Structure formats: C-alpha cells, structure tokens
C-alpha cells in the first residue's frame, strides 16, 4: 500500500528532520522536503539521506531551494522569488512517502499562505513533532487546534526530547491525540543508533499502511 505522511512540528529546530530520517529508514520510504531554506550547510535532504542511509533515488528534489536560512516567505523574498503553493504537487511514487515541512506548522510560504494551508489542501495524515520540555503543552495544543481547524488529519504526536511523562500524558489527554512515542536526544547521532532508538520507542504499525 502506498503510504503518505507529513512530518510537521510545533517549532523550528524541534527535530523533524532527524525524526523523518528515522521514519524513512523504518518504512523504506521516499523523502521529500518541498521547501529548503538555507543552502550553505548540510540541507535537510542531505541529512535524511545520511541518517536514513537512503539511496539517491529515495531523496526527491525540493520544489523550492532558497539561499537564506529563514522563514520560507522571507527567504524567497531575499532571493527575489515568490513561492507558489499551487505549483507544489505531491510526487508520485510506488514507495511510502514522507513529506517534511519547514519550521513550525504555521510558517508562512508567502504573504497569503501558511504551510498548514498547504497541508489542508493535501489532506495527508500528519505527525506533529514536539518537545516535552516546559512550555510545550501550550505550543502543542495550539498546533493541534490549528490542524483540526483546517481538517488536517492528525496521525499523532511524536516527542523528541528527554522524558517528561506528565507532559506527554497531558498532551495526549487534553489534545485527544495518539502519543506515537518519544525519540530521545542522542549524544552520538549515528545512523545505527538512530535506527535502534526509533525501533525501541515507536511501533511501526502506527505508521505503516496509512494511505490517502
């Protein structure tokens, strides 16, 4: 079955790319980052290729490659272009597909459209990546409300942080959302340790066979 999943987050730097790499490896999935902001350092596609140990055929080219590491709307403006969401079409593939957003859920693509608006059009099940640190209950519940107000299918929340049982349980209960698991912070972020950590902390059946 051809599975398609969106990986988004409550904030930038939340760990979406590392989680996406682990998920791609576990599912044998193709990875697509529609918008890449910042090209001087290792891009998210390059990080996923390295950590997922994915072949070049499983890393699809970005729809927009922008030079400045900033919000997509600003990065595009500095590059003298405008991101046109209507030109971003979901790639066809016979393999599972993991789509990673840029920054947080409500990051603007241009002066009219947020990433969440694009996800609402696509109607693909989304995984919300969140911390379990102080302040995350508010951030995560607000993100869930924003997703549901747009009828974005929510697969569940994936925590990427040190353990905080009360916070994780509270979010799952008040947010009426599935707690998919928690990816701990790894001192040695090698492909092998990442794959092992994901396998220990998540159930692959929660992700496999999701199709829209």
Swiss-Prot record:
GO BP annotation list: biotin biosynthetic process
InterPro entries noted in UniProt: DTB_synth_BioD, P-loop_NTPase
Enzyme Commission number(s): 6.3.3.3
Catalytic residues (positions): 33
A GO cellular component entry from the record: cytosol
Stored NCBIfam families: bioD (TIGR00347)
Family listed: Belongs to the dethiobiotin synthetase family.
Protein name, UniProt field: ATP-dependent dethiobiotin synthetase BioD
Organism: Brucella abortus (strain 2308)
Lineage: Bacteria, Pseudomonadati, Pseudomonadota, Alphaproteobacteria, Hyphomicrobiales
Gene (name only): bioD
């Amino acid at each position: 079955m051809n599975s398609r999943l969106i990986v988004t987050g409550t904030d930038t730097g939340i760990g979406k790319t590392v989680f996406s790499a682990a998920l791609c490896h576990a599912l044998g999935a193709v990875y697509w980052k529609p918008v890449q902001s910042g090209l001087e350092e290792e891009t998210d596609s390059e990080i996923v290729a390295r950590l997922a140990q994915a072949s070049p055929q499983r890393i699809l080219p970005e729809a927009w490659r922008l030079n400045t590491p900033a919000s997509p709307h600003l990065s595009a403006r500095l590059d003298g272009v405008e991101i046109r969401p209507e030109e971003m079409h979901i790639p066809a593939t016979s393999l599972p597909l993991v789509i990673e957003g840029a920054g947080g859920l409500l990051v603007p693509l241009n002066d009219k459209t947020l990433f969440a608006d694009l996800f609402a059009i696509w109607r693909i099940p989304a995984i919300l990546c969140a911390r379990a640190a102080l302040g995350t209950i508010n951030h995560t519940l607000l993100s869930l409300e924003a997703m549901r107000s747009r009828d974005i299918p929510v697969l569940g929340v994936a925590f990427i942080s040190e353990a905080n049982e009360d916070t994780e349980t509270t979010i799952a209960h008040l947010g009426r959302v599935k707690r998919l698991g928690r990816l701990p912070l790894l001192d040695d972020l090698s492909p092998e340790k990442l794959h092992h950590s994901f396998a220990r902390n998540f159930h692959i059946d929660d992700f496999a066979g999701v199709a829209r």
